[in-house]
Each structure stands twice: as structure tokens, then as C-alpha cells.
Amino acid sequence: MTEALDTRFTQFLLESQALKFGSFTLKSGRQSPYFINAGAFDDGAKIATLGEFYAEKIQQEIAASNLAARIDTVFGPAYKGIPLAVATTIAMQHRFNASIGYTFDRKEKKDHGDGGTMVGKPLEDGMNVLLVDDVMTAGTAVREVVPKLKAQADVNIVGLVLSVDRMEKTKDSDLSAVQDVQREFGFPVFAIANVKEIFAAGRQLIGEHGQPYVTDEIAKAAEEYLTQYGA
């Protein structure tokens, strides 16, 4: 039997050293005992594998009728979302024979050459756009790109796929950033794995020294953090 998607993804995060344990200051100012570092996906093999996980999650949600079957382009917000969008569309083609465009934004408008604020598949009225991003902390990137997309064309944003849902409440409410974005914009948000799934899987996965990746000490620190900040 094939291992669950979240378990395989957790192993990938750990082996890529993208999931780190220690003490980290987040954008929110919170001190977290764990951190997801998307910068660790720094070579062709890792980013290709990451794209495969995104594609598998997308296909899973389409099959469950949670996500529109027609996706015209995958949009990744600059900068970290750019390789995600490209890798995801390549994986969708290779694994599922689905030819989908990719689009990303420029941080600054270009006034020469092809110009404009967008790169990749041009946005047109009625297109179904799927957003991809790495880890959502407060939803700031989404709130910035949605108006940008709508300013280009009357597109339908059909959803957002993340690598990890940290499942933390925002500063302003008891909702998580994911729940807050879903409520505000009305499109579904999916994650390849959430933090609870990751820690549950990490307790079972054995590292190179014969010990679980997630020790009792790490699990306790994560549990205490989520007791305080979890949504």
C-alpha cells in the first residue's frame, strides 16, 4: 500500500532539511520551535520532487471534487512562488498529461520589451487560475496578488495550494491564516500537509541514527506552541 501523501511529504521535508527544529522568530514576531525553509529546495531534484507533490495534491482535490477540474494557469507570487508554479505545471504535464500554463508577477513593472507586471501565460477574462505558495503565516502575499490578478483580467481564482498549513491563529482572530483567507476571498485553500500531520508522521519516521526525526522533546515544544497559538 502506498504511504499517505502527508507522510511521504514529511519525509521529503526532513531529508531535504527544509523542516528545521530549534528557536525561530517568525514574521509575526512569534518564537517558533520549528520552521519550514523553502530555500532548502535549492536544486533540480528537490524542486522537481516538490512539484510532484503539488501536482499530486492538486489531482487529489480535483478527484474529490474539491477543486475545479479545469485549470488554465498556475500562478506563483514573486519570488518564492515562481519556481513552485513552474515545477507544478511541469509535474502536471509529466504525471497527468495536463497541459497548464504558468504565470507570475514582477515586483516592479517593466516598461520595455514585453512590458507589464505579469510573466508567462497571459491572463484573460474567464480563465481559471490556481494559486500556489509555500507556507502561509498571515496571508499577506495572497492579499497582495489577488487585486493584481483582478486588475489584469476578470479571472476566476479557483483555489490556493500550499506546501504546509501551520494551523496558527492570526493576531486579529481565532481563525487560522488559511481559514481567514478562505472567509475573505471565498476560494478553497489546500495544503500538502498540515503541521499536526507532519509531527505525527515525524514521530514514526526514523532518521539516519536510528532515532525518530521528531523526538519527545521536539514534539512537546511543538505541542506547547500550538496550545498557545494554534487555531
Swiss-Prot record:
NCBIfam families: pyrE (TIGR00336)
GO cellular component terms listed in the entry, alphabetical order: cytoplasm
The organism of origin for this protein: Bifidobacterium animalis subsp. lactis (strain AD011)
Family to which this protein belongs: Belongs to the purine/pyrimidine phosphoribosyltransferase family. PyrE subfamily.
Signal peptide range: none
Domain of life: Bacteria
Cofactor requirements of the protein: Mg(2+)
Protein name per its UniProtKB record: Orotate phosphoribosyltransferase
Pathway the protein acts in: Pyrimidine metabolism; UMP biosynthesis via de novo pathway; UMP from orotate: step 1/2
Enzyme's top EC category: transferase
Glycoprotein listed as a keyword: no
Catalysis: reaction(s): orotidine 5'-phosphate + diphosphate = orotate + 5-phospho-alpha-D-ribose 1-diphosphate
Known role: Catalyzes the transfer of a ribosyl phosphate group from 5-phosphoribose 1-diphosphate to orotate, leading to the formation of orotidine monophosphate (OMP).
EC number: 2.4.2.10
Swiss-Prot/TrEMBL keywords: Glycosyltransferase, Magnesium, Pyrimidine biosynthesis, Transferase
